[in-house]
From Swiss-Prot:
InterPro entries: Kinase-like_dom_sf, Prot_kinase_dom
Molecular function in Gene Ontology: ATP binding; calcium/calmodulin-dependent protein kinase activity; calmodulin binding
Source species of the chain: Xenopus laevis (African clawed frog)
Record comment regarding domains: The protein kinase domain is predicted to be catalytically inactive.
Protein name (record): CaM kinase-like vesicle-associated protein
């Protein structure tokens, strides 16, 4: 039955395995993620294709928690740039989450297949991500694991929309903010690395990282020493993130507009209370105006993508950091120490007042108080 596990964990609401097999055929295994297996599934009555995530309870408490969390969050949200929940089943041994099927490609694959790729293409991607995130933030939902691998084209049509996936780390932000560090190291915001309480601004930082990569083919933060072990690699990486130590390097950024650099800088502001919100970023001229260049940057971006993201350590870097032990923040310098200057590379281009506080709901969205902690499951 649709949304069968109304009360997660209540034995009287367990579905029998045949309730799943009577309704759906589980087909090809698409991939194996940290907490689950992802299948392509077909609804028997209609022939429609969906994505199915299967979580095995025997894999431990973290897996069970991730499944219940993703279900609870997906039941809350409905937006055209977010993969929608279709059906849920809980048996004694498994959780099954059925969602819309995104039959398109990851953004990287799309770029590599294009004959022409410009800032305008990136602006279109970032606009859709910002709109979805502004919606989530209006509900006090923090995704906490935004990264390129979680952005998909919904189908293979030329004008396909972008959809955000993977909500097992998402959390409802309460008035006390969030203290549990998690996410993918290369996309972590400084406040997470510093083990401070944090909230919705971490998603905006991650969007800045995504935008930086899409415009240059390079990650903004990387371990120059190319340490092989994760702990040394992460320590070097985290030190750079804490200080906002990135540059608009030549020649990769030579043809990128000042407006694009300005938005990256606003999204990747080290101080979370000064970081631009998703709702405000949508009004930036690079998103809603005509500031995005239409110059073809494909050759340079693709060359760097193939160089950087084919490395084994970057393939492994999609790992998710969920345990405090893995998140060892390096020592912080004096708060008064300025971050490396990027003034020579940026030109202010948002003709709007200073960014509103980071917890401001999206424009036009209801001004909701943050729900109580028990809404997160």
């Amino acid at each position: 039955m649709p949304f069968g596990c109304v009360t997660l964990g209540d034995k009287k609401d367990y579905n029998h395995p045949t309730e799943v097999s009577d309704r759906y055929d589980l087909g090809q295994l698409i991939k194996t993620e940290e907490f689950c297996e992802v299948f392509r599934a077909k609804e028997k009555s209609s022939g429609k294709l969906y994505t199915c995530k299967r979580f095995l309870k025997r894999d431990g408490r973290k897996v069970r928690k991730a499944a219940k969390n993703e279900i609870n969050i997906l039941k809350m949200v409905k937006h055209h740039n977010i993969l929608q929940l279709v059906d849920v089943f809980e048996t004694r041994k498994e959780y099954f989450i059925f969602m819309e099927l995104a039959s398109g490609r990851e953004v990287f694959d799309w770029i590599l297949d294009q004959g022409y790729y410009s800032e305008k293409d990136t602006s279109n991607v970032i606009r859709q991500v910002l709109e979805a995130v502004a919606y989530l933030h209006s509900l006090c939902v923090v995704h906490r694991n935004l990264k390129l691998e979680n952005l998909l084209y919904f189908n293979r049509m030329k004008n396909s929309k972008i959809v955000i996936s993977d909500f097992h780390l998402a959390k409802v932000e309460t008035n006390s903010l969030i203290k549990e560090p998690c996410g993918t190291p290369e996309y972590l915001a400084p406040e997470v690395v510093a083990r401070q309480r944090y909230g919705r601004p971490v998603d905006c930082w991650a969007i800045g990282v995504i935008m930086y990569i899409l415009l240059s083919g390079n990650p903004p933060f990387y371990d120059e020493l190319e340490e092989e072990d994760y702990e040394s690699h992460d320590k070097n990486l985290f030190r750079k993130i804490l200080h906002g130590d990135y540059e608009f390097d030549s020649p990769y950024w030579d043809d990128i507009s000042p407006a694009a650099k300005d938005l990256v800088t606003r999204l990747m502001e080290v101080e979370q209370d000064q970081r631009v919100t998703a709702a405000d970023a949508i009004s930036h001229e690079w998103i809603s105006g005509n500031a995005a260049s239409d110059k073809n940057i494909k050759d340079g971006v693709c060359a760097q993508i193939e160089k950087n993201f084919a490395k084994a350590k970057w393939k492994k870097a999609v790992r998710v950091t969920t345990m405090m032990k893995r998140l060892r923040a390096p020592e912080q310098t004096d708060p008064g120490t300025p971050s490396p200057s990027k003034d020579s590379d940026k030109t202010p281009s948002m003709a709007t007042p200073a960014p509103s506080p980071a917890n401001t709901p999206a424009e036009g969205a209801p001004s909701l108080p943050c729900p109580s902690p028990d809404t997160t499951g």
